[in-house]
């Protein structure tokens, strides 16, 4: 889930191929995924639907596989998994894919403009603030794809080998660095970016890696560029019943460094920082997709609100939401938070204030289960 500037487009990627039955994962037939496009500008308390596109999407990976360019003329969405039939004919067997779609958001209605191939299993992606470059973290490819954006078109112009599975990436505020999540090695890699020549140059030196908490899965950089927050999932299976953390990274220091860890409940995945930089929200799975007889199962997920004061990050409250919350995004005015509840196939709207989070009661039905 991601939002952009005025008219404040909000993208929601829906995956209808994956579901759970009594806590057991099931793989369903492809062909029913979609991308929902909303405008959160006119009424942030209840975003208005703009369009729904038939488009493949995947729950596999962090819920940051889509992004909107700063000028809002295009969007990117990565589909991390191909979906072939099993050899024995008994259903479907997901496998790493390579597809990335470019959406023309200026068209009426919005439309698919390009289909590109990037590295294997494209997961999290990010567009720089100048709108000239995008990076895609490829989990199975152990690489980061580099995409040039110009004239409403996107071109794959490179791939950086990082030597280990990576699942999420985010640009620094100045666009000269980016940070990539190395989930298997519990590290955050630093990418150096040079756009001074015709072809952008992106490099990676493992010696600059930072150690995060266990199983980092997602990250976000603050609007002022001073800090990054890394979701430490704690277990490759997300929920395992144990408390997890969010690593706080000082990006103003040389070199950048972890300065704190804030404890959160079991199974953090989605994360977003408000446009005004005052708050961050973390989606907590809390075993809501696990079998009911598991000791750590909860029927609902949770959102934890974090308060940001300079480089200091503290808990500011929590609230229960629907089952298996994935993507989260703030409204342009920072007063509302949108939560994609996967198993409920809905977008829930929370109010954000000095007293924390409150439920507005608004539930927006979606044409599928929101994976991002």
Region locations from a protein language model:
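Predominantly soluble domains enriched in secretory-pathway, periplasmic, or organellar proteins
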Residues: 1-372
């Amino acid at each position: 889930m991601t939002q952009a500037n005025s008219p404040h487009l909000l993208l929601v990627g829906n995956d209808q191929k994956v579901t759970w039955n009594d806590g057991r994962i099931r793989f369903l037939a492809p062909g029913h995924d979609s991308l929902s496009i909303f405008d959160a500008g006119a009424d942030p308390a209840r975003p208005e639907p703009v369009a729904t596109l038939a488009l493949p999407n995947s729950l596999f990976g962090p819920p940051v596989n889509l992004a909107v360019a700063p000028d809002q003329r295009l969007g990117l969405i990565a589909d991390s998994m191909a979906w072939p039939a099993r050899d024995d004919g008994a259903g479907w067997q997901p496998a790493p894919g390579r597809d990335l779609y470019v959406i023309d958001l200026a068209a009426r209605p919005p439309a698919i403009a390009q289909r590109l191939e990037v590295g294997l299993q494209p997961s999290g992606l990010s567009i720089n603030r100048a709108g000239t470059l995008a990076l895609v973290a490829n989990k199975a490819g152990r690489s980061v794809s580099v995409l040039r954006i110009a004239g409403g078109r996107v071109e794959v112009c490179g791939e950086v080998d990082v030597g280990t599975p990576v699942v999420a990436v985010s640009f620094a505020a100045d666009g000269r660095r980016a940070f990539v999540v190395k989930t298997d090695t519990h590290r955050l890699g630093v990418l150096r970016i040079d756009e001074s020549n015709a072809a952008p140059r992106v490099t990676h030196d493992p010696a600059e890696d930072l150690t995060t908490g266990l199983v980092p899965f997602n990250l976000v950089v603050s609007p002022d560029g001073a800090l990054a927050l890394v979701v430490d999932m704690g277990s490759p299976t997300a929920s395992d019943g144990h408390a997890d953390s969010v690593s706080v990274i000082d990006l103003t220091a040389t070199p950048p460094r972890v300065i704190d860890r804030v404890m959160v409940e079991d199974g953090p995945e989605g994360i977003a920082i408000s446009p005004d930089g005052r708050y961050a929200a973390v989606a907590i799975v809390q075993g809501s997709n696990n079998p009911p007889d598991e000791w750590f199962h909860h029927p609902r997920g949770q959102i934890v609100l974090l308060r940001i004061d300079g480089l200091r990050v503290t808990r500011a409250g929590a609230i229960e939401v629907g089952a298996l919350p994935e993507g989260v995004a703030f409204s342009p005015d920072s007063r509302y938070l949108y939560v994609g509840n996967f198993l409920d196939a809905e977008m829930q709207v929370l109010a954000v204030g000095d007293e924390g989070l409150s439920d507005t009661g608004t539930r927006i039905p979606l044409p599928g289960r929101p994976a991002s």
